[in-house]
């Protein structure tokens, strides 16, 4: 929320109000660039840190939830509910021009990425349960099928135009596969 507030409100204030004031001499260079650096480095930086944490919590929550259908349903519901304010905040001028207001169909919020990531984990686990056996051939088949699921879901994320796109799906999946190694998870 902090980075979205920064991008929606502070960026427009910087461009519409403070930059003309700076150009007119009503604000010093230090003042203008100090506010700009705070907005871009601090507030947007908080948002950059948030996504990996969301992915970690999602993959960990996948193991600890008692009702995965409800978990997926809740994530989808939150993605749909949060899409309207997201689209209005970031893309209202485009959606009005396209006649789809309040929806902008060319970009989806981060919760769609998290929803698809969660769905990927469910499918990966179902594939692992379907392909049983302890032999080397079974393990290779299982890994290849799970990798195929990740690739297909990453393509879907790109087609739907989710925030973080295929990278988000790969990141959630990577945290799932590396869940027993905290050292490798932190390197991601």
Tell where the protein language model's regions lie, with residue ranges.
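Alpha-helical transmembrane segments and their immediate juxtamembrane cytosolic regions
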Residues: 1-188
